[in-house]
């Protein structure tokens, strides 16, 4: 996963590099030329994310474990239709087909005595989704989504024991879509998916539910898209991204702890968890060219992204929580129509983890450093306020729990945040 995060950033920045030079300096209020959001569109994109399998085994003292984790990336094809209901409200439906390698993996290498590997992969699936959005500018749509999701899972092992199964579920999320030029738009969105995998023929003995946290970026071609005076019922605000800003955000995400056992003889990726977080930030952006913005930012976050074990029948529970941390990041973005910024980011990340159990005296906490990278879209709501949707992947140094190398946990995190920023000057 050390390079997989670059998929979303590459899609965002490569699209902005291809924009025409006619998107002039947008620090003054543009004319009220609208955009035609009505009609069919097709799209291609990809994304990155994590999965958490929650396992319940009823005979084992009410055993519930959330959970078994995995991560990876995927590609996606989209077809959809939108209708502009009012000057600012857009509603539509779309279908996506995706293929990828989001997986939980186990590798054991004790050669020449024993070797084994296995993985459970989300290899392909599709969604049928409705969405409704609000035009924060004539060419930038903020939206929420929800619908049906179908996912195929495949178990592959090195000993010839393989199986596959399908699961139905639902998906919820939100995002931003911005016009690039002409018929082309770019969207970035977060989706939470929930699937009931059932009991695998074991009756009430076993129950498995899986959830996914994914970030999607897609380039779309709109057959009826383009500038139109008919849609120009309101003008975009005047905003300059350069300046000092403070912000608040909230989001969802997943953590995956990759386990190295006995110095690497066994590797399991991994132990998963999920949850929500809040965030405050301060940053400064510079205008380095007519449409290019570069900046630095510091964030502090707190939350409950956690792995949970519950043995209610024995009166025992335990959790490992990513409870607070901070990032120091730099970002580079391109300003498109109507004061909308498409950007990539990278920097350092610090995270605190807390292990709590219901047994007095058995607790543990640790700090770890790492790096983070990601991408997002930010749009001006007024001459002082912007809104953004942003994905970050973070990877941290391992922790051996004072085991002398017998066990090491290497955490990585996938988070999506929705935020508001206020420009001070």
Feature map (PLM): residue ranges:
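Gram-negative outer-membrane beta-barrel domains
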Residues: 3-9, 14, 20-425
């Amino acid at each position: 996963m050390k390079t997989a995060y670059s998929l979303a950033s590459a899609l965002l920045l490569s699209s902005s590099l291809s924009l025409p030079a006619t998107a002039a300096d947008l620090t003054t209020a543009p004319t009220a030329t609208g955009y035609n959001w009505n009609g069919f569109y097709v799209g291609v994109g990809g994304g990155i994310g994590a999965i958490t399998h929650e396992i319940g085994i009823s005979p084992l003292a009410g055993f519930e474990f959330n959970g078994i984790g995995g991560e990876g990336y995927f590609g996606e094809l989209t077809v959809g239709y939108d209708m502009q209901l009012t000057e600012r409200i857009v509603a539509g439906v779309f279908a996506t087909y995706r293929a990828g390698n989001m997986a939980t993996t186990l590798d054991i290498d004790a050669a020449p005595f024993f070797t084994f590997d296995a993985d459970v992969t989300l290899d392909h699936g599709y969604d049928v989704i409705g969405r409704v959005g609000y035009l924060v500018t004539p060419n930038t749509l903020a939206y929420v989504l929800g619908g049906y999701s179908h996912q195929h899972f495949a178990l592959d092992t090195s000993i010839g024991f393989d199986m596959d199964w399908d699961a139905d579920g639902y998906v919820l999320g939100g995002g931003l879509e911005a016009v690039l030029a002409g018929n082309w738009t770019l969207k970035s969105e977060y989706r939470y998916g929930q699937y009931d995998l059932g009991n695998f023929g074991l009756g009430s003995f076993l129950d498995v539910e899986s959830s996914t946290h994914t970030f999607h970026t897609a380039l779309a071609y709109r057959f009826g898209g383009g500038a139109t005076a008919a849609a120009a019922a309101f003008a975009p605000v005047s905003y300059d991204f350069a300046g000092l800003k403070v912000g608040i955000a909230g989001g969802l995400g997943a953590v995956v702890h990759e386990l190295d056992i006995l110095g690497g003889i066994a590797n399991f990726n991994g132990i998963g968890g999920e949850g929500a977080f809040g965030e405050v930030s301060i940053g400064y952006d510079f205008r380095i060219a007519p449409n290019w913005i570069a900046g630095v930012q510091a964030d502090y976050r707190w939350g409950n992204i956690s792995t949970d074990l519950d043995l209610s029948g024995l009166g025992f529970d335990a959790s490992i929580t990513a409870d607070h941390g901070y990032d120091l990041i730099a970002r580079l973005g391109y300003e498109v129509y109507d004061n909308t910024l498409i950007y990539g980011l990278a920097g350092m990340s610090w995270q605190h983890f807390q292990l709590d159990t219901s047994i007095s005296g058995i607790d543990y906490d640790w700090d770890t450093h790492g790096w983070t990278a990601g991408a997002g879209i930010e749009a001006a709501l007024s001459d002082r306020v912007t809104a953004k949707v942003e994905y970050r992947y973070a990877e941290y140094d391992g922790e051996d729990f004072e085991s002398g190398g017998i066990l090491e946990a290497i955490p990585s995190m996938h988070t999506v945040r929705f935020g508001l920023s206020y420009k001070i000057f």
